[in-house]
Amino acid sequence: METTQTSQSLYQALWNSADVLRSKMDANDYKSYLLGMIFYKYLSDKMLFFVAETMEEGTDSLEDALEVYRNYYEDADTHEDLVSVMNDELNYIIKPDLTFTALVARVNEGTFQLEDLAQGFRDIEQSDDLYENLFEDIDLYSKKLGATPQKQNQTVAAVMKELAVLDVAGHAGDMLGDAYEYLIGQFATDSGKKAGEFYTPQPVAKLMTQIAFLGREDQEGFTIYDATMGSGSLLLNAKKYSHKPQTVVYFGQELNTSTYNLARMNMILHGVPVENQFLHNADTLDEDWPTQEPTNFDGVLMNPPYSAQWSASSGFLNDPRFSPFGKLAPQSKADFAFLLHGYYHLKQDNGVMAIVLPHGVLFRGNAEGTIRKALLEEGAIDTVIGLPANIFFNTSIPTTVIILKKNRTNRDVYFIDASKEFDKGKNQNIMTDAHIEKILEAYKSREEIDKFAHLASYEEIVENDYNLNIPRYVDTFEEEEVEPLTDIVSKINETNEAIESQTASLLEMLNQLHGTTPEADAELKEFLKNFKG
């Protein structure tokens, strides 16, 4: 069996497998099909190799592993014990004839039927709560796959053949998880504006996660929460910056069911233990979640939809998430509603929250101004970081990362203007590791940095009427060098001499003109007289 040897070749091979679907639907639709089938192959391959090793008949060949599995599964003497071990260790079972390897064999024989794959999906979903409804967004009988059942069958079979040669089980854990992340990022690029609901660009995720973990990289059992988790990309960055990644406990909430299922798959592919993931499919701005311990977290990371609509029902004034701040976020701009939800779930001691929002939250008035003032009076806002424009897939507007903490001993706010920290990309601006490092170093120092960072006292903020617009605090104006007056006079004289020379040349040419009639000649002479002054 052909296998990919490096993460980059795996990434490319996975992306190439999308070619079959790319001509039939847009990326926002075909991502569910491709990612779902990759996930099914991962579960199938992992199971086959697990059985072969458990029965002490280890092999690198999926076909041989399937043969081992089939023999023990169909043997009445070993069937019950094998199923028991698989349920205990894997939490799922795929029948031999429904494994990805068996289905691909039928594809090659020309006997594959879509119902076989659909049954495999159903069996996984019914095997454990962890997998419930996981494949519900994958409609194998959609007209998008083909106008007829035969065409639909052919499309799915072609994708399966592309995926069959990939060694996904051999790349299990972070490499496969990162490959999945790569695909999600590629889909985000292809999807354009639709991508914002499920993906946070890695440089921004990296910045926010490192800030959340700063000084706590060695902490065991670090709890992290994203109330608008999308595909889980932002949450899963924790694995990269915790020195005890297997002990990190993840809490996430997502409204969109398709995206929620994507996050569930992403967690499993990254090898997050079942007992360390708590994901919820619901509206963050409706009933509160989580409501059972733990309800407060070491880190809160959020990239909510910007200026979204929400109910802003007056009943929320009695909700402990919002009631301390006297006002509700406007119905047409839920930004502060998301922020206050996340802040409510932050631990009192040493909790750190990072949220990405549009700049309007820094200076808009009315209800938002009241909420902002209350947060500042409480000392909740620790740092404001201005990001470059056009770094997100779903918007070109500049955004800000706001860092919040509870129980601070002062109320100053550190401002970082990182709006120029980017490289120009083909369609978007790109923040590099060097840009992120510059921001992090400033954040750690909280020192004055000319044209980049400023530590504003609470008194200074009050003087600015609680307006946090970054240019009020960080002056990035570049003075132009003043040219000496003698140089300016010299240039004026040179210009005047050039004008005189050109005027003389023009007059010489005009003097050679003659009118074709006495009237025209008189008119021309009058013009020359006026021109000479």
State the predicted function of each range.
Residues 1-212, 275-284, 386-389, 411-419, ...:
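Non-catalytic, mostly N-terminal accessory regions of nucleic-acid modification and defense proteins
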Residues 5, 287, 294-533:
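A conserved structural/catalytic subdomain of Rossmann-like adenosyl-cofactor enzymes
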Residues 6-7, 25, 170, 185, ...:
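Hydrophobic alpha-helical segments and their boundary regions
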Residues 21, 215, 345-346:
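Hydrophobic helix-cap positions at the C-terminus of alpha-helices
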Residues 28, 171, 219, 245, ...:
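Residue-level signal for short amphipathic helical patches enriched in basic/charged
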Residues 194-302, 307-316, 322-328, 336-337, ...:
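Conserved S-adenosyl-L-methionine
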